[in-house]
Amino acid sequence: MASDRGPSVLVTGASSGIGAATADLLASRGFQVFGTSRNPERATQRAPHIAWLAMDVRDDASVREGVKRALDRSGRLDALVCNAGYGIFGSIEEVPLSTAREQFETNWFGTLRVLREAMPALRSAPSARIAIVGSLAGRAPIPFQAHYSASKAALDSLALALHNELFATRVRVSLIEPGDIRTAFNDATDFDLVRDSHYGERAARSRQVIERSLARAPGPEIVARAILRALTTRNPRIRYTVGREARLVSFAKRWLPERLGLRLIRRHFGV
């Protein structure tokens, strides 16, 4: 993945949070970074050292044009970081189906669109890497965040299937699985989607636990460092579980009976 200009990488959702920290770190390590944003002008003001591309991962034409522009400017693509996403809060019963579809349109189908457009260039590279940013919630679903958790579980399956599909090629795939991370992503989560919920205090307690956990969580730089390792290590891991809490939960999921694991989740979130 070496060249005079350094390897080229496309990072989706690069204007804030994990994406911004990743784009900054990769640029500092010599990567030619193409960052996507729905508002590239504002993103350029924050980080002029990144080559910004307008892209809405929900739109086929926008994704196609964004990937094309990156290839036109660099001539190749050595790595892809699929990071664009957001969260919603509310019960399975009360979140409108249209809102649930929108969650998957960004988190799941958005990732799929970018992968499909970038794959031919990645397969043509001498050695290429893909990092898909999932979440611990994909393996330990959060009460009243079922839609977000399910979208991340879908990315978990996507990353593992893609790893096997590309195993005979020169492309390596890693799933990045962070726990709670303190970013602007959390501010963008719609906690007031469902007002006057039938679940009352239980939903309120779950929200309070989430907000307290996020307030004391590590910053996005810890995830950016894991992504850097996935893109530069000779034999990258299939899964990078990021953060002490995430590693503990991953261990518990592996060894505890499922019923006990669900009970611990209920106790933690006060539901």
Protein language model regions, located:
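Conserved glycine-rich cofactor-binding loop
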Residues: 15-16
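Rossmann-fold cofactor-recognition segment
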Residues: 47-61
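Substrate-binding pocket helix/loop in short-chain dehydrogenase/reductase
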Residues: 91-92, 96-101
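Active-site loop immediately N-terminal to the catalytic Tyr-X3-Lys motif
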Residues: 93, 140-146
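Active-site helix of classical SDR
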Residues: 115, 151-154
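Residue(s) in the substrate-gating loop at a strand-loop-helix junction
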Residues: 135
